[in-house]
């Protein structure tokens, strides 16, 4: 399954489903914990395993076998774990949670263990890794946006808006921008500047977008860094051109929350997850869904899709 084009989804029905992206067929269903929805999913860089997080749990599943139970349960996790992701070589994983901490997990050791911790002094809703593989962007419920250098332990902190909770953060693949979206429908963008004599990137305020009328749930940059995506509780996923941050497209799933999304490697297609329990594949040029992935019985709150292997083969 490692080289297949697969989509993984998870949500409020306590299951994680693995789909053939090109057919819409569900090829595997894995049980999550009965006490939590799935908050985030990420596939390991070698594409053999899938990590999932939720309330007081982080689990790692094997995609190569028929086993539907997790192969690793991470110990000692408190409160809600909101985000996770992998360093590009798979040597470590980061997680963010409502225990106020962003943690670095050593994935080479057996079993994996927490090797480093950053205290945000407030529940952490979001975290993302800079393409330089050294800095992590973070957003907290008290409105702070952090940039943390994992190696030097230095960090920068900005509060873009008072009395607003940061719901998601994203860093563009070219490393030029950091975006943070909040519960008031606003998305803030900073230019990331660095020079040889600097220890870490600095954040320069660049743009504020009044992106949605309601809660923003996710923000993500396209792989080519030309688009910024925001998804919301207002039933839309909006795409903004990073050249001037003007709106380019609006995808509508009326009356439902759009919880998560993922781009294809060529930045021409988008997967969305929504509260109607359906994942959709959209062709961005036409603004229309071309495929639906149905099988979840409740809202889908997280998805993961990576097709870099196919892209490399084609090139």
Curated annotation (Swiss-Prot):
Family: Belongs to the WD repeat LST8 family.
Main subcellular localisation: cytoplasm
PANTHER family linked to this entry: G BETA-LIKE PROTEIN GBL, TARGET OF RAPAMYCIN COMPLEX SUBUNIT LST8
Keyword Membrane among record annotations: no
Domain of life: Eukaryota
GO biological process: regulation of actin cytoskeleton organization; TOR signaling
Pfam families per UniProt: WD40
The entry's keywords: Cytoplasm, Repeat, WD repeat
Source organism (scientific name): Drosophila pseudoobscura pseudoobscura
Subcellular location: Cytoplasm
Lineage: Eukaryota, Metazoa, Ecdysozoa, Arthropoda, Hexapoda
One Gene Ontology cellular component: cytoplasm
CDD domains noted in UniProt: WD40
WD repeat windows: 1-31, 33-71, 76-115, 119-158, 161-200, 211-250, 253-292, 295-315
PROSITE patterns, sorted: WD_REPEATS_1, WD_REPEATS_2, WD_REPEATS_REGION
Name of the protein: Protein LST8 homolog
